[in-house]
From Swiss-Prot:
Induction trigger: Transcription peaks at 5 hours of bacterial growth, followed by a reduction, and reaches the lowest expression level at 12 hours of bacterial growth.
Protein name as catalogued: Peptidoglycan hydrolase Cwl0971
Organism: Clostridioides difficile (strain R20291) (Peptoclostridium difficile)
Composition bias type Basic and acidic residues, residue spans: 191-205
MF terms in GO: cysteine-type peptidase activity
Described purpose of this protein according to its UniProt entry: Peptidoglycan hydrolase involved in cell wall lysis and cell viability, which affects toxin release, sporulation, germination and pathogenicity. In vitro, exhibits hydrolase activity for B.subtilis cell wall.
GO biological process, alphabetically ordered: proteolysis
Domain SH3b: 28-91, 110-174, 203-267
Family affiliation: Belongs to the peptidase C40 family.
Length: 427
């Protein structure tokens, strides 16, 4: 028989821990989103419809708990369910001021964990993103596990630093602490210096699978400087591999490092980049606009930030006049992305956005540029999106009578190539 004892705080009576499918949470309990973007759904299941999207650091009121899901209040009018794995509750922060002692809300654990991230993992003073950074761990580092609390591990690094890190990026391992650890080593920007764990893989090629431009860096990690870019479909020569990064040789002869997450080994040969001079025709005469047939991407760091953020919104439904975060129209989507990704404020309506910033000639589009269209055939702008590279753009598609959603389309398609008017750059 399952017995649930109600905790009566006024009498100080403790509750016996029991397993129940669903319990009510205190209306005062708060949670903080720990994922970069978290879908909020109509019910406690990933099969339920999305009703909103929340971003890292957002604080919500927790109304109910059920089988690994939290029912949360997003706004005065929106309530939905989010995975508890990506919501850190306020209760998990109690007692974390002294990092050498177990927290009152954490469960003591033992063993070691291995860091699994594409870049570096933040280590914080408490179990939540609202706590200050006390260190960083690199991909492949092995750390000592001390406690577990609401999707966070309390860990001890090889240099003695103790703090909290998201358990999403740590897997339990039998390896010893300090294995592959580089948290305390001096970083280098010299890509010719071979890391100790580098594995030679001469004679193989790799193909870029990223939907957006892929950064090429001077070393195996995001802390290294960007020395080039690759587009989806590019084939490069693989030289070696180190902790989730490939050392590659580009067709231009440049040697650098790229994340292995976006490279698949291939039998295809490397190619010289096609001369893009055929695409350099300016749109000085809007009445004789050529169809879009391709582009030479010249990405920037801010452009990549814009595109990466826009991709987190894919699938959000169209609603005429909406500007987010749970519904958009086309210009509401672009305005929201520029504001929340790089802090740039642009006009609200599409025709004004098409006159904002700097005009970019066809063939010179870069990821993060605004692209604008005339879908009515009257010569004026009535639709906008954001160029993501590789001749593709992301936009909130739909009309007032035929709503759609945020998605990616190809500018070289028979339809979009004919209605494209141009591009503008805001950063």
């Amino acid at each position: 028989m399952i017995v649930v004892k109600k905790a009566i705080a006024a009498l100080g009576i403790g509750a016996v821990a029991v397993s129940v499918s669903s319990i009510n949470a205190s209306a005062l309990e708060k949670g903080t989103v720990t994922a970069s973007a978290l879908n909020i759904r109509s019910g406690p299941s990933s099969d339920c419809d999305k009703v909103a999207k929340l971003y890292k650091g957002k604080t919500v009121e927790i109304l109910e708990k059920s089988n690994g899901w939290y029912k949360v209040r997003v706004s005065s009018s929106v309530v939905g369910w989010g995975s508890a794995k990506y919501i850190s509750t306020s209760g998990s922060s109690e007692g974390t001021s002294n990092q050498n002692n177990p927290t009152s809300s954490g469960t003591t654990i033992s063993g070691n964990g291995k860091v699994n991230v594409s870049s570096r993992l933040n280590v914080r003073s408490g179990a939540g993103t609202n706590y200050s950074l006390v260190g960083k761990a690199n991909n492949g580092d092995v750390v000592k596990l001390l406690e577990q609390s609401n999707g966070w591990y309390k860990i001890k690094l090889s240099n003695g630093v103790t703090g909290w890190a998201s358990s999403q990026y740590i897997s339990k391992t039998s390896e010893d602490v300090g294995t592959n650890n580089s948290s305390n080593s001096n970083s280098t920007n010299n890509s010719d210096k071979k890391p100790s764990s580098e594995e030679s893989i001469e004679g193989k090629n790799g193909k870029v699978t990223s939907a957006v431009s892929l950064n090429v860096r001077s070393g195996p990690g995001t802390s290294y400087s960007i020395i080039g870019k690759l587009n989806g479909g590019d084939v490069v020569e693989l030289k070696s591999k180190n902790n989730g990064w490939y050392k590659v040789k580009l067709s231009s002869g440049t040697i650098g490092w790229v994340s292995a997450s976006y490279i698949s080994e291939t039998n295809e040969g490397t190619k010289e980049k096609p001369n893009s001079s055929s695409n350099q025709n300016s749109q000085s005469n809007s009445n004789s606009k050529p169809s879009f047939t391709g582009n030479s991407d010249k990405s920037t760091a801010k452009g990549s930030t814009i595109v990466d953020f826009a991709y987190t919104l894919i699938g959000i439904p169209y609603q005429w006049g909406a500007s987010g975060p749970d519904k958009f129209d086309c210009s509401g989507f672009t305005q929201y992305v520029f504001k929340h990704s790089v802090g740039v404020s642009i006009p609200r309506v599409s025709r004004e956005q098409a006159n904002f910033g700097s005009a970019i000639s066809m063939g010179n589009y870069a990821p993060g540029d605004l692209v604008y269209f005339d879908t009515d055939g009257d010569g004026t702008t009535n639709h906008v999106g954001i160029y993501v590279g590789n001749s593709k753009f992301i936009h909130c598609s739909g009309t007032q009578t035929n709503p759609n959603k945020v998605k990616v389309d190809n500018l070289t398609s028979s339809y979009w190539s004919k209605v494209l008017l141009g591009a503008r750059r805001f950063v």
